[in-house]
Amino acid sequence: MFTNTPVGGKRERQNGAHPAWSTLGANSAQIHQNTADLASKMHKLRYTKIRSPPTRVSIESITPKQRFPAPNFEQAYHSNIRYEQEESDNEEFENVVKNGHEASTNVFYESDGDDEEFVNEEYENSIDEESDDEGYSLNEDTTATNASFRYPMNQRSTRKSQFYSSKFKPLLWFGITLFSTLLIITLLHKGQEFYSRSFSSDNSQPSNSPVPNIPPASNDTKTSLKPDIIKDFTDSPSKVGGNEEFDYSTGDLITKKEFDKILQQKVEQLKQSLKEEMSNYKSSVPFEVELNDDWKFFIESTVRKYLTDPVSMPNFALLSTGAEVLPALTSKRYVRRPSAFIPRFTSYFFDSLVVRGHEPSIALTPNNAVAMCWSFQGSEGQLGISLSRPVYVTNVTIEHVQHKIAHDLSSAPKDFELWVQGMSSKMFVLLGKARYSLTEDSIQTFSFESSNYIVAEPIQNVILKIKSNWGNPNYTCLYQVRVHGTVPNADEQPIPSLGEKAESTAENTGQDSS
């Protein structure tokens, strides 16, 4: 706290005080009076401007050219206030001595908000010398500007109200605009409905002509429309609609029974006219086309053949008869994921984002519907099949969707190879190559009967290798594969292979030479 204790006395001079302090007075009483006046003025100025606690003798001056962080007096300061670097005590007293004991302070106070701004202003306030109160309790300016500094809570509430007004004012205007727009739209809609109703009610009358006053219909007018029908309806409704004929072209009022009778007459007339037209058409046809027995037999046999099976050969690669897919020798089915990074990453956790083809086993079922096929990635793949029983393979059938109903024929297989494995062999042997054509029928059978001598025993496993397709770079579709052959008998000798034929030929040649 501030006291009137002299500072420029003997003790300070003995402790190495600045020489400029000695010029404040010749003796201790004068020094005491001068330093007390100076401290009171400077203390009052500092507390009024920047709300700092009082000091004993001097305060550090704030200049606009030098910047320094605000001193920490354990009070709450706003973070947006910037303070300048203050002068030391010695520099302050040197300036005081040079300026003739006039305490002046240059204050530079800024803020980013709506706070007040003070730049290079001098404040000199009178001091009641007879008062022994503290420096900050002397005569102070009670204007609104100084009051805001003495009471920072008022200034904070002002800033808070300004903040809320600046934030919520656009929302308020937006709400008013929206309400006005909705009100205008509602009024226009109601006005349109009112105008349409008034226009429909006055459609028969021009807008510029007065509406005539039509008197209400009297009972005499109502009964004059058709008095006999009204009389019959009121006396006995069952009598109305007898066998008498009605003139319905006059536009008179009729009952429901009369209308039903008229409608029935019209329907009978239409039926009669239709029968006459059909009889005239039959009489105009000169003769009927009659087929002989040969043509009938040919058509029936052809239809029966294609209704049962167009190939008419046993299929040993049918899933329902015991054939199986060899997963280790079969390519993976086609899987398509999104191309973007985030959906592609998400597709590994959510299967709904992935497009997957059918399993390879669908190629062993007789289903020729569109898209009911086994699809694999790219244009090359293979399908390993374990036949339902060991056979001598003679034919292979490749089936694709009908060309007339296919969406895209570029995914059909083109070149393929057939590899086979005997019952006691561990190696697969190439049985032959072929090409599926798009210009021929959708079900094409290829013969491999001339290559049976390559394998000497019945075949259990086959591999169909697709080498290319008809232009689709993404996937290839295979609808159905059929493997045909002959079943070996129990006492039948196995067909000699090409190697066995060479060995037997060499043995016969050796016996002849001996």
Curated annotation (Swiss-Prot):
Q: What does this protein do?
A: Associates with the spindle pole body and maintains a functional interface between the nuclear membrane and the microtubule motor proteins. Involved in chromosome segregation during meiosis where it associates with the telomeres.
Chief location category: cytoplasm
Q: How does this protein sit in the membrane?
A: Single-pass membrane protein
Name the PANTHER family on file: KLAROID PROTEIN-RELATED, SAD1/UNC-84-LIKE PROTEIN-RELATED
Taxonomic superkingdom: Eukaryota
This one is known as: Spindle pole body-associated protein sad1
Localization recorded for this chain is: Cytoplasm, Cytoskeleton, Microtubule organizing center, Spindle pole body; Nucleus membrane
> Which GO CC annotations does the UniProt entry carry?
cytoplasm; inner plaque of mitotic spindle pole body; interphase microtubule organizing center; meiotic nuclear membrane microtubule tethering complex; meiotic spindle pole; meiotic spindle pole body; microtubule; mitotic spindle pole body
Q: Gene3D superfamilies recorded for this chain? A: Galactose-binding domain-like
Which residues does the UniProt record annotate as the domain SUN?
A: 322-488
Biased composition (Low complexity) is annotated at: 198-219
Q: How does it assemble?
A: Interacts with bqt1. The bqt1-bqt2-sad1 complex binds rap1. Also interacts with cdc31.
Entry-linked Pfam families: Sad1_UNC
Q: Which GO terms describe its biological process?
A: cell division; centromere clustering at the mitotic interphase nuclear envelope; meiotic attachment of telomeric heterochromatin to spindle pole body; mitotic spindle pole body insertion into the nuclear envelope
Q: Which parts of the chain span the membrane according to its record?
A: 168-188
In what ranges is there compositional bias, type Polar residues? 505-514
